[in-house]
Regions:
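Solvent-exposed loop/turn segments at secondary-structure junctions
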Residues: 19-24, 32, 53-58, 100-101
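Typically the conserved alpha-helix immediately C-terminal to a functionally engaged Cys/Sec
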Residues: 25-43
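Chalcogenol-based redox active-site neighborhoods
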Residues: 27-30, 54-59, 82-88, 123
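Thiol-/selenol-based redox modules, centered on thioredoxin-like
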Residues: 102-142
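Short active-site neighborhood of thiol/selenol oxidoreductases, capturing the structured segment around
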Residues: 8-26, 48
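A short, hydrophobic beta-strand/beta-hairpin element that forms part of a small beta-sheet core
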Residues: 48, 79-82, 88-106
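A short beta-strand-turn-helix
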Residues: 1-13, 42
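Thiol-based oxidoreductase modules, predominantly thioredoxin-like and allied folds used
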Residues: 38-74
């Protein structure tokens, strides 16, 4: 996904920012992303991209080049700072629309039940017509 001259493919993206040393990241990957209902919703609405912010690869996003400069002040890949609204919190899930615009960035572990609702909220474009609180209240009454 983060390669040079990559054309948008008109599919929404979920960027899962995680590191090898993050236990919570591994648990979320093992429990949340492997949940059958979550997996079904993801494949229907999104392309899932795993992103380790400690990579040394040169990456490209929105026609810009990003590196991991390994400085004391910026110990992670520059791209994680460009994508995240929440700073360096792991795990973190970035939701993007079809034009690769960041719609939301949600940090920390999300269990399958919560994540299913979030995936529906963004995957089905509900966020464009309702706020999160209204959407959740409607889900609770079903």
């Amino acid at each position: 996904f983060f390669i040079k001259d990559k054309k948008p493919d008109q599919k929404k993206k979920i960027i899962f920012i995680n590191t090898e040393w993050c236990n919570t990241c591994r648990v979320m990957y093992r429990t949340t992303f492997s949940d059958t209902a979550v997996s079904s919703l993801l494949s229907k609405h999104f392309e899932l991209v795993n992103f380790n912010p400690e990579t040394n690869d040169k990456l490209y996003f929105q026609d810009k080049e990003f590196d991991n400069i390994h400085s004391k002040e910026l110990p992670f890949h520059q791209l994680v700072y460009a994508l995240s609204r929440n700073g360096l919190l792991f795990p973190q899930v970035i939701f993007m629309d079809e034009k690769n615009t960041v719609v939301d960035a949600i940090p920390f572990y999300l269990n399958p039940n919560v994540f299913k609702n979030i995936v529906r909220f963004y995957g089905e474009d509900i966020y464009k017509t309702k706020n999160w609180e209204t959407f959740i209240k409607e889900q609770e009454t079903k």
